From Swiss-Prot:
This is Prostaglandin D2 receptor. GO terms for cellular component: plasma membrane. One of its GO terms (biological process) is positive regulation of cytosolic calcium ion concentration. The chain crosses the membrane at residues 22-42, 59-79, 108-128, 151-171, 196-216, 263-283, 311-331. The gene is PTGDR.
Length: 361
């Protein structure tokens, strides 16, 4: 029986009027972005060094970034080829592999939900690491090691594997979305099935909690950075040796917290875009579970659900490009010249003027 709200659930061909162009562009953009991000990590973030120089150990932050990049790359490589193949053969996911019935659709939906949740959890781990490094440096230095950071990806993978497999054992349901090239868990049910709707609400609630936790961690890290800035101003107060020249404050600040500022800016932008891409899915899951949807609006509701899924899939494409931009030396130099140096010089100049006025009196 075809679900009333999912008209493409049992279709065997791709719905007319749809093109693979956008899917191909998104796949190639995500693939190139993740590969470039991995190249940057291998070149600098994970400890590349000149000949005859000791190789520095990778930082916990870069280990986590590496895990997130690998996760996004795997998700993109496991999902997009099936979408492009479905368009090329004009077959839906249910019929793309003859004799598989709905097995491929089930696997596709599992992979989509798995990597969507795994990327979110790893982004939370990065936000926690940044917060601890700024707010609790002693605890961070003593307990957070690169080896422990490398354990985040396997632990996250094990949890997501168990959680996202629940629809395969009857708690929740995977369905095929129009135009026949997407499969995901069902968010609207004509009979208000408790198991189907409970899983979608549980998934959305977990995503919402993760989003809130990431935002709180970043806000706390920003507060710690502001406190560091106030301490820096204290070093540049009148009578302090560091006030003699602007470069001294800058040299003092650069190794102390400018790298952490880079990390925080990277996390903040990734979090904003991640939140924008995740909230539509969270909203659609709650909307389908708690609001009675008229049967005649089934097509409209499915279109909105599909739009939310596409927003979710953009995360793995955007994240590596943000990382590439922020780790580019030209961008970092531009940012520090525009934002950091004027701030330090302003503090030095105001303190210097105050000292001159006091001496003239």
């Amino acid at each position: 029986m075809r679900p009333l709200f999912y008209r493409c659930h049992n279709t065997t061909s791709v719905e007319k009027g749809n093109s693979a162009t956008m899917g191909g562009v998104l796949f190639s953009t995500g693939l190139v972005g993740n590969l470039l991000a991995l190249g940057l990590l291998a070149r600098s973030g994970l400890g590349s060094c000149p000949p005859r120089s000791p190789r520095p150990p990778p930082s916990v932050f870069y280990v986590l970034v590496f895990g997130l990049t690998i996760t996004d790359l795997l998700g993109k490589c496991l999902v997009s080829p099936f979408v492009l193949s479905a368009y090329a053969q004009n077959r839906s996911l249910r019929e793309l592999v003859p004799g598989s019935d709905s097995s491929l659709c089930q696997a596709f939906a599992f992979i989509m939900s798995f990597f969507g949740l795994a990327s979110t959890l790893q982004l939370l781990a990065m936000a926690l690491e940044c917060w601890l490094s700024l707010g609790h440096p002693f605890f961070h230095r003593r307990h957070l090691t690169p080896r422990r950071g490398a354990m985040v990806a396997p632990v996250v993978g094990a949890f997501c594997l168990a959680f996202c497999a629940l629809p395969l054992v009857g708690f929740g349901k995977f369905v095929q979305y129009c135009p026949g090239t997407w499969c995901f868990f069902q968010m609207v049910h004509e009979e208000r099935s408790l198991s189907v709707l409970s899983y979608s609400v549980l998934y959305a609630s977990l995503m919402l909690l993760l989003v809130l936790a990431i935002v709180l961690c970043n806000l706390s890290a920003m507060r710690n950075l502001y406190a560091m800035h106030l301490r820096l101003r204290g070093l540049l107060r009148p009578g302090s040796r560091e006030r003699a020249e602007p470069g001294a404050g800058e040299r003092e600040a650069t190794p102390l917290h400018l790298e952490e500022l880079d990390h925080l800016l990277l996390l903040a932008l990734m979090t904003v875009l991640f939140t924008m891409c995740s909230l539509p899915l969270i909203y659609r899951a709650y909307y389908g579970a708690f609001k009675a949807v008229p049967e005649q609006n089934g097509t409209t509701e499915e279109t909105e659900d599909l739009r939310a899924l596409r927003f979710l899939s953009v995360i793995s494409i955007v994240d590596p490009w943000i990382f590439i931009i922020f780790r580019t030396s030209v961008f970092r130099m531009f940012f520090r010249k525009i934002f950091i140096r004027p701030l330090i010089y302003r503090n030095w100049h105001s303190n210097s003027c105050q000292t001159n006025m006091e001496s003239s009196l």
